[in-house]
């Protein structure tokens, strides 16, 4: 019997080995060494959360060399007698970083799907963003300049590759399904906002502006007998390239900071978020552009409305009072900067300085034949270009075709019109469908927050996305700002990423 039991156990082991033969595992590994197949749900949640943190840190750090190399010469373009500066090389690192973190984001999404952190069967509506990506490829291929539409043009760098990076960041955000991981990600995002705000404030103070690099320290003002003339203007940009990018980023992050300050249970986090919010409020005002004021105002007003309704459900008026105080403090900061002449709107000068001086891709401004406000003027140009390229657009970032249509600049400073003119009516319509689906999810998140069904992070990401969409009417997408929106949008979708699993557990 002893020997019989021994041979029977050996036969069983042999049978088990045989049944595992022929199975494919990730990276060609065996089942025991396949760390992804053996990963627990908690480990998968940690992987997704940690990667999203790494992604936002990379997006923050990668822009810094572009600033500190702006005056370092490395050669001469003799064909046009132009000095070459090292920052022209580093700007490509930013778009490359967006592509890289987006590509890895897709991989993280696939892993999350394997580990049931994202249930594709419960998210069939993902077919819409997939269609947007595939049709964007067609728009790129039909462009008059496929190379530019694929890689992007110079410092804009918003070609097809960057678009893929954006959607990869959306996918990465969608995988962060554990609420504690969302809170930790929020901590890093708010920290980045505070960092950019501090840099922006230092750029706007004459005494410190001398040592903090900035592309908007001097604004192009025209030509004279001696050549080009500039005026000193201390404008906040952070390390985000332009005041418009700073406005977009701080709009998104202010929503995280304000909601975390109002509703989180930890006192230390409340204090950190509150201080960060004050810094971001000041820096946003010092950006001196309409979308900064519009986005910031939307954050406070929407959060105040939510807090008022929440106080009725929870019978706790502390968040509403705290939000009202924050709103008053923000008004005080604005009044102080306005009284000291530090606040002024310089949208038109900034727009043309950015395109003419920083990017060298357009003329010096519009003619003197009109007194129309700059935004409707640019919107008219954008709509005309869209009408001439109605179905598939000009192709992503294809500035050449835009200029051929008579536009004075390659952007309309309205993200929706920019999308319509660059990628056409079909992709525009599908993107609107995607945004409507996202807004519906946001409404459900806020409704759930009112009834304590989900945490404040759902309210924060909803406010962040909505306020970004509001300021986008006066702004442009950018490799330094748009990634934060796409991560926030992914976080909105993360709350329904595992819908069926949640139902089974309940």
Where in this protein do the model-derived segments appear?
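Juxtamembrane membrane-water interface segments that cap and precede transmembrane helices
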Residues: 73-88, 148, 223-239, 373, ...
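Membrane-interface catalytic loops of GT-C/OST-like multi-pass glycosylation enzymes that act
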Residues: 150-155, 244, 288-295, 410-414, ...
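N-terminal hydrophobic segments of proteins, predominantly signal-anchor/transmembrane helices
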Residues: 54-75, 99-164
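Alpha-helical transmembrane segments of multi-pass inner-membrane proteins
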Residues: 10-18, 22-23, 28-29, 40-61, ...
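Membrane-interface capping segments at transmembrane-helix boundaries
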Residues: 497-505
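TM-adjacent membrane-interface loops and short helices in multi-pass inner/ER membrane proteins
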Residues: 208, 345-349, 353-409, 416, ...
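Alpha-helical transmembrane segments and their immediate interhelical/interface regions
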Residues: 74-95, 147-178, 293, 346-353
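Helix-to-loop transition at the C-terminal end of transmembrane segments
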Residues: 67-74, 145-147, 200-214, 338-349
């Amino acid at each position: 019997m002893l020997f019989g039991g021994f041979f029977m156990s050996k036969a069983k082991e042999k049978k088990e080995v045989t049944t595992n033969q022929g199975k494919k595992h990730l990276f060609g590994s065996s089942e025991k060494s396949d760390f992804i197949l053996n990963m627990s749900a908690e480990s998968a949640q940690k992987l997704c959360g940690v990667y999203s943190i790494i992604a936002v840190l990379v997006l923050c750090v990668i822009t810094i060399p572009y600033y500190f190399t702006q005056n370092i010469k490395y050669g001469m373009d003799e064909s046009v007698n132009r000095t070459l500066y090292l920052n022209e090389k580093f700007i490509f690192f930013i778009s490359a970083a967006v592509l890289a973190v987006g590509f890895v984001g897709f991989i993280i999404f696939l892993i999350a799907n394997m580990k049931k952190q994202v249930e594709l069967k419960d998210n069939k509506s993902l077919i819409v963003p997939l269609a947007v990506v595939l049709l964007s490829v067609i728009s790129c291929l039909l462009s008059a300049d496929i190379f530019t539409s694929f890689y992007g043009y110079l410092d804009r760098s918003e070609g097809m590759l960057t678009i893929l990076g954006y959607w990869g960041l959306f996918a990465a955000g969608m995988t962060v399904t554990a609420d504690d991981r969302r809170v930790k990600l929020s901590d890093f995002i708010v920290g980045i906002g505070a960092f950019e705000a501090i840099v922006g404030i230092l750029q706007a103070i004459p005494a410190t502006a001398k040592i903090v690099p900035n592309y908007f320290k001097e604004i192009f003002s025209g030509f004279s007998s001696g050549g080009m003339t500039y005026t000193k203007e201390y404008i906040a940009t952070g390390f985000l390239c332009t005041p418009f990018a700073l406005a977009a980023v701080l709009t998104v992050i202010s929503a995280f900071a304000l909601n975390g300050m109002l509703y989180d249970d930890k006192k230390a986090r409340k204090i950190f978020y509150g201080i960060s919010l004050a810094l971001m409020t000041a820096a946003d005002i010092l950006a001196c552009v309409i979308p900064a004021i519009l986005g910031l105002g939307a954050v406070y007003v929407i959060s105040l409305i939510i807090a008022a309704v929440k106080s009725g459900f929870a019978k706790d008026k502390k968040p509403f009072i705290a939000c009202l105080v924050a709103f008053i403090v923000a008004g005080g900061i604005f009044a102080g900067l306005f009284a000291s002449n530090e606040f002024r709107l310089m949208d038109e000068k900034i727009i043309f300085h950015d395109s003419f001086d920083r990017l060298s891709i357009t003329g010096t401004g519009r003619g003197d034949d009109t007194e129309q406000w700059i935004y409707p003027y640019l919107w008219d140009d954008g709509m005309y270009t869209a009408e001439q390229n109605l179905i598939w657009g000009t192709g992503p970032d294809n500035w050449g075709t835009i200029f051929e249509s008579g536009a004075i600049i390659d952007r309309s400073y309205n993200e929706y019109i920019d999308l319509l003119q660059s990628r056409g009516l079909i992709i525009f319509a599908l993107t609107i469908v995607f945004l409507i689906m996202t807004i519906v999810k946001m409404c459900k998140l806020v409704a759930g927050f009112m009834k304590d069904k989900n945490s404040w992070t759902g309210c924060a990401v909803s406010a962040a996305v909505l306020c970004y969409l509001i300021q986008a009417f006066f702004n442009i997408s950018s490799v330094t700002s748009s990634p934060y929106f796409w991560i926030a949008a992914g976080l909105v979708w993360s709350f329904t990423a595992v819908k069926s699993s949640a139902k089974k557990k309940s």
